[in-house]
Amino acid sequence: MYDFVIIGGGIIGMSTAMQLIDVYPDARIALLEKESAPACHQTGHNSGVIHAGVYYTPGSLKAQFCLAGNRATKAFCDQNGIRYDNCGKMLVATSDLEMERMRALWERTAANGIEREWLNADELREREPNITGLGGIFVPSSGIVSYRDVTAAMAKIFQSRGGEIIYNAEVSGLNEHKNGVVIRTRQGGEYEASTLISCSGLMADRLVKMLGLEPGFIICPFRGEYFRLAPEHNQIVNHLIYPIPDPAMPFLGVHLTRMIDGSVTVGPNAVLAFKREGYRKRDFSFSDTLEILGSSGIRRVLQNHLRSGLGEMKNSLCKSGYLRLVQKYCPRLSLSDLQPWPAGVRAQAVSPDGKLIDDFLFVTTPRTIHTCNAPSPAATSAIPIGAHIVSKVQTLLASQSNPGRTLRAARSVDALHAAFNQ
């Protein structure tokens, strides 16, 4: 019997595993991952941005964890020899309406304690000669990294401290009892843990349902499609270039990202995926589609964002529409500059009343902790999210009437934060 089993080998699961074994070095800990390697889904299919925390409601978990995670991610990379580029982010306004929205973002960045600089049109042009706009906000702390590399380093640390990673282990059933949790996999494996931690991303709601519980949310998969610019445009921008987001839209808009390998990507958009892990336009699951369209919450989201959703779908099917979104602030680009690049799928939790759950969300039972909503900036925030989960583990252990083996914490969660922010 394990003391802890963690489900999910993305960056949240690996961060949690690494920090949990640091706090409880004598614990028997296993991480189950359904793929043959870590970071195969959301972690390995995002833009790699180290976010600063510009957009998030002051005081929210997203705002707190993103600010802490920005520093912790860079510190972790420094400590483990992982390359990153602290290139900064430029938010660009291209109309009077966007200038008004940019002023609101300026106030929010102040409330979130983020260093930033206001630029007029001339100053913007001086910093970014190929970008057109009425003004911008420069955020120097934003950067770029390979979160696959970060996750791989976390996995190596976890294993070096005695943790066990079991790949090709897709969870098919959970049974919680008074002394622990039994975990069954499609491959025929059976594991038992005193405490279970689920960091299951696109499958988060299904793991809660396996316990016989109604999760109170459903995961809606949104595919984010990217292009890569032709190599001759690798120097077209000096920073990450973001449009000013439309408050009516749930996502940040199509942006230009300087990748860690020197290439520049365009994207992502946000298109409803008809399969939980539907990375290609043609990917379709009848059961997943029935589940999506059978959800009153998702139907309300689609109704509330009908116009923008149809626009996203049109631009997904028509490359010229996608291009126009980028040409608003980078008119130099043409259709031939947009080359194919792998898509990602976002796991967005939706409430029954049709609200996109805006903050990170965790659900606990006497023996389990579930990470239920961890969209962007979860990768940036992975280290503080992991520490937050470890704190929840400590609370759970203290409340258990029969906690199993006595585990002594070798260090506090506060010490974890300090270690990653030296």
UniProtKB/Swiss-Prot annotation:
InterPro entries: FAD-dep_OxRdtase (IPR006076), FAD/NAD-bd_sf (IPR036188), L2HG_DH_bact (IPR030862)
Keyword presence, Cell membrane: yes
Enzyme class: oxidoreductase
Pathway in which the depicted protein is active: Amino-acid degradation
Chief subcellular location: membrane
Named cofactor requirement(s): FAD
Stimuli inducing this protein: Expression is induced by RpoS during carbon starvation and at stationary phase. Is also regulated by cAMP-CRP. Repressed by CsiR. Makes part of the operon glaH-lhgD-gabDTP.
GO process annotations (BP): L-lysine catabolic process; lysine catabolic process
Keyword Cell inner membrane: yes
One cellular component (GO) term of this entry: cytoplasm
Compartment annotation: Cell inner membrane
Entry keywords, A to Z: Cell inner membrane, Cell membrane, Electron transport, FAD, Flavoprotein, Membrane, Oxidoreductase, Transport
Catalytic reaction list: (S)-2-hydroxyglutarate + a quinone = a quinol + 2-oxoglutarate
An MF annotation (GO) of this entry: (S)-2-hydroxyglutarate dehydrogenase activity
Top-level lineage group: Bacteria
EC number: 1.1.5.13
HAMAP family xrefs: L_hydroxyglutarate_dehydrogenase
Biological role stated in the UniProt entry: Catalyzes the dehydrogenation of L-2-hydroxyglutarate (L2HG) to alpha-ketoglutarate and couples to the respiratory chain by feeding electrons from the reaction into the membrane quinone pool. Functions in a L-lysine degradation pathway that proceeds via cadaverine, glutarate and L-2-hydroxyglutarate.
PANTHER family: L-2-HYDROXYGLUTARATE DEHYDROGENASE, MITOCHONDRIAL
UniProt similarity note: Belongs to the L2HGDH family.
Name of the protein described by the UniProt record: L-2-hydroxyglutarate dehydrogenase
Species in which this protein is naturally found: Escherichia coli (strain K12)
Gene: lhgD
